[in-house]
């Protein structure tokens, strides 16, 4: 095996001994987690390679300084990478490792803390939320209850790891992605450090993954410099170590795919509602495939991928001439492909900034500036999308068609006999497969186009395995099902909740089935939402002393898991389909009342998830089923923008006159006003919709005479005196009057006969 691959394995597994140490296993000698880790890993023959074992044994200064390793040992690279990922050079720290002899400083029972404890703490204070140790649960909420991780829990994890390392995991270029997936599945809620002098909010998975990414970059950087004496360059004398931290070894890279929302929503054909989710999944998978193409060109792994979602990706790459050339070539190739396939509907842009180890550790206070610079450079790229040659290419590929696609309305592309372009035809073709199958296959044969003469198809597991055997270039993604397999690139967490597919009667009709009801207005509810001030949170939300690349990776992964995995659990049972759920924004369509009720549940879950440190704003519209989806999207987007004005943390409901705080909607409108009215009407034989309509008419009319008329209407009603007095008092207050009108409208929509 080549040295770089051994380094990737070793740097990813360098802290495996921490889990074994915390298990109190009698099978291993006492000592540091490094020593215990190497003893544990040596049990498994495929992993007994010097680059792997040395990275586990000697990734701390004291052990490395006293070792007799060769000058070209990759353990020196793992040591530097571990320091950068940890956010500090730990050379001067006494007892800087977990193990025997440091029991007072390290608490092996300590749970993983929530990253949100420190997020926005300068404005909202520090929190003390931690996660429980539950091996089988993919997603967990932090709580403020006191917790301890027990040695028996760690022992069970060691047994699981032993079984997998013995029987499932392999060592080789086609198997590394499986190991990376394995560490995510098992280590995401294990604290990287149990040092009581530190904040324990970075998981062992996030730390190990970032260490691997940094190590891979350093290896490529030194290789291009023809440097093979890693000890001299990185370790001894120490002045060389400090100098290396100051070198521009890395590139922070941002990749952006623009035009996503217009591509998804700007359709108007008879199958528009049915193909919405398919269009979203297509673009999401396309972005993942783009990232893997780029990483493959660079001979790097998904460890170097910091984040994907919402049409964006961030990567950590080596600052080498080769990497910069690959980025330029890749961007040009992708832009050309997008122009040929999508014209200007979709486009791609890449920006990057060279950075040092000190930048990534924030030891010089430049970490936030690094991200801001990359963001600014990307904005400049997007503002000047096309070069002269690319504009010429666009003009040369214009197709003067006589027909337009009945779904996307494009006329610059060949149209089939069914009046569909090839892209819409393929997207519609995979719609049913998306509901039933969980494997996305990227291969030379398929239904919708991807770059480099490949196509996307959706298969069951047997179908995916057959395609692998037919073509070794096949790439497979599993959806919400982590697997360990040779060519399985990665599991993609995707929120695929779609209530309409759960019942054979509604499956064929899809989203349109949500207007089928016996009572209540037959309308679709549309929600668009995104997190408030997320960009600021990423750049400045983590206080200066805690900023590091590992915490940024932790924060982005937690947000991604909430919206791509946990959201399905939150929506369970609701008549809703998730059209789009990225790392920070959301688009739902469903029965109008389910959309509102679940929006309130989602807001509470998000508050719980983020320890109250983050909020989101939303627009909620209500539409007839045949209303153009493009207008639903744009109009609800306007409502979302209204909700994000001022203090944010709001919802704009139905129109621009109804912008409420979330608590205001739930407590003052629904609980305080709507529910008492609903109960009163349920218990009364005299009052129904006509009574509500009359009240609405009087409340909406600003004439003074209507105050007396409202008082008269209430006095003659059979409502309780307490409720009539409350209604009249609410009508005299401007804000409460709007709340009352909204409550009555909500109730009318609930009880009116279906069309």
Curated annotation (Swiss-Prot):
CDD domains: Cas10_III. Residues 522-656 form the GGDEF domain. Its cofactor is Mg(2+). Pfam families: Cas10-Cmr2_palm2, Cmr2_hel_dom2, Csm1_B. Its EC number is 3.1.-.-, 2.7.7.-. Synthesis of cA6 is inhibited by EDTA. GO terms for molecular function: ATP binding; endonuclease activity; exonuclease activity; RNA binding; transferase activity. PROSITE patterns: GGDEF. Transmembrane segments: none annotated. SUPFAM superfamilies: HD-domain/PDEase-like. It catalyses: 6 ATP = cyclic hexaadenylate + 6 diphosphate. Keywords: Antiviral defense, ATP-binding, Endonuclease, Exonuclease, Hydrolase, Nuclease, Nucleotide-binding, RNA-binding, Transferase. Residues 1-87 are annotated as: HD domain. One of its GO terms (biological process) is defense response to virus. Synthesis of cA6 requires Mg(2+). Encoded in a type III-A CRISPR locus. The N-terminal HD domain has ssDNase activity. The C-terminal GGDEF domain has the cOA synthesis activity. Part of the Csm effector complex that includes Cas10, Csm2, Csm3, Csm4 and Csm5. Belongs to the CRISPR-associated Cas10/Csm1 family. PANTHER family: CRISPR SYSTEM SINGLE-STRAND-SPECIFIC DEOXYRIBONUCLEASE CAS10/CSM1 (SUBTYPE III-A) (PTHR36528), CRISPR SYSTEM SINGLE-STRAND-SPECIFIC DEOXYRIBONUCLEASE CAS10_CSM1 (SUBTYPE III-A) (PTHR36528:SF1). CRISPR (clustered regularly interspaced short palindromic repeat) is an adaptive immune system that provides protection against mobile genetic elements (viruses, transposable elements and conjugative plasmids). CRISPR clusters contain spacers, sequences complementary to antecedent mobile elements, and target invading nucleic acids. CRISPR clusters are transcribed and processed into CRISPR RNA (crRNA). This is CRISPR system single-strand-specific deoxyribonuclease Cas10/Csm1 (subtype III-A). The lineage of its organism: Bacteria, Bacillati, Bacillota, Bacilli, Lactobacillales. The gene is cas10.
């Amino acid at each position: 095996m080549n040295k770089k691959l051994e380094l990737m394995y070793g740097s990813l597994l360098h802290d495996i001994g921490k889990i074994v140490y915390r298990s109190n296993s009698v099978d291993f000698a006492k000592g540091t987690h490094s020593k215990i880790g190497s003893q544990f890993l040596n049990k498994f023959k495929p992993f007994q390679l010097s680059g792997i074992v040395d990275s586990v044994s000697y990734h701390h200064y004291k052990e490395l300084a006293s070792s007799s390793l060769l000058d070209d040992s990759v353990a020196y690279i793992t040591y530097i990478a571990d320091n950068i990922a940890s956010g500090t050079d730990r050379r001067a720290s006494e007892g800087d490792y977990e193990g025997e002899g440091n029991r007072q400083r390290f608490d092996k029972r300590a749970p993983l803390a929530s990253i949100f404890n420190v997020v926005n703490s300068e404005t909202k204070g520090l929190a003390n939320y931690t996660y429980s140790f539950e091996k089988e649960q993919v997603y967990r909420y932090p709580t403020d209850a006191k917790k301890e991780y027990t040695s028996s829990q760690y022992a069970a994890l060691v047994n699981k790891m032993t079984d997998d390392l013995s029987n499932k995991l392999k060592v080789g270029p086609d198997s590394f992605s499986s190991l990376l997936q394995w560490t995510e599945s098992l280590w995401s809620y294990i604290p990287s450090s149990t040092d009581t002098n530190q904040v324990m909010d970075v998981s062992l998975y996030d730390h190990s993954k970032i260490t691997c990414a940094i190590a891979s970059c350093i290896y490529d950087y030194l290789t291009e410099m023809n440097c093979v004496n890693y000890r001299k360059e990185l370790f001894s004398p120490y002045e060389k170590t400090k100098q290396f931290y100051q070198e521009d070894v890395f590139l922070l890279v941002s990749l952006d795919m623009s035009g996503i929302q217009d591509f998804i929503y700007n359709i108007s054909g008879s199958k528009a509602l049915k193909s919405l989710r398919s269009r979203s999944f297509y673009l999401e998978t396309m972005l993942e495939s783009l990232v893997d193409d780029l990483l493959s060109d660079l001979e790097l792994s998904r460890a170097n991928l910091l984040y994907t979602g919402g049409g964006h990706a961030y990567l950590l790459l080596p600052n080498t001439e080769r990497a910069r050339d690959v980025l330029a070539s890749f961007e040009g190739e992708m832009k050309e492909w997008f122009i040929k396939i999508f014209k200007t509907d979709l486009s791609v842009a890449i920006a990057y900034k060279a950075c040092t180890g000190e930048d990534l550790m924030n030891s010089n206070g430049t970490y936030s500036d690094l991200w801001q610079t990359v963001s600014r450079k990307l904005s400049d790229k997007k503002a000047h999308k096309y070069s002269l040659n690319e504009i010429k290419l666009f003009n040369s590929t214009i197709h003067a068609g006589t027909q337009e696609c009945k779904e996307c309305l494009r006329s610059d592309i060949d149209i089939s006999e069914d009046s569909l372009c090839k892209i819409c035809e393929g997207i519609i073709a995979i719609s049913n497969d998306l509901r039933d199958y969980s494997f996305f296959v990227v291969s030379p044969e398929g239904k919708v186009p991807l770059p480099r003469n490949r196509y996307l198809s959706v298969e069951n597991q047997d179908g995916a395995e057959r395609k692998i055997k037919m073509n070794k270039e096949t790439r497979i993604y599993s959806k919400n099902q982590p697997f360990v397999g040779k060519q399985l690139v990665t599991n993609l967490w995707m929120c695929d909740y779609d209530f309409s597919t759960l019942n054979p009667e509604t499956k064929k009709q899809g989203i349109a089935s949500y207007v089928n009801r016996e009572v209540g207005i037959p309308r679709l509810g549309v929600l668009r939402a995104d997190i408030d001030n997320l960009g600021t949170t990423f750049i400045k939300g983590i206080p200066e002393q805690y900023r590091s690349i590992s915490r940024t990776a932790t924060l982005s992964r937690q947000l991604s898991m909430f919206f791509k995995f946990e959201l399905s659990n939150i929506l369970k049972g609701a008549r809703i389909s998730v059209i789009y759920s990225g790392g920070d924004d959301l688009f739902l369509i469903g029965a109008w009342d389910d959309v509102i009720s679940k929006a309130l549940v989602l807001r509470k879950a998000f508050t719980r998830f983020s320890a109250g440190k983050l909020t989101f704003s939303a627009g909620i519209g209500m539409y007839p089923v045949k209303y153009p989806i493009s207008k639903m999207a744009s109009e609800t987007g306007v409502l979302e923008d209204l909700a994000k004005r001022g203090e944010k943390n709001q919802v704009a409901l139905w129109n621009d006159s109804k912008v409420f705080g979330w608590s205001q909607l739930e407590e003052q409108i629904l609980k305080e006003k709507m529910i008492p009215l609903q109960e009163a009407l349920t218990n009364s034989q005299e009052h129904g919709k006509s009574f509500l309509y009359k009240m609405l008419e009087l409340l909406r009319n600003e004439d003074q005479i209507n105050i007396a008329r409202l008082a008269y209407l209430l006095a003659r009603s059979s409502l309780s005196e307490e409720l009539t007095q409350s209604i009249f008092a609410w009508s005299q207050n401007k804000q409460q009057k709007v709340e009352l009108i909204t409550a009555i409208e909500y109730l009318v929509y609930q009880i009116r006969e279906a069309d």
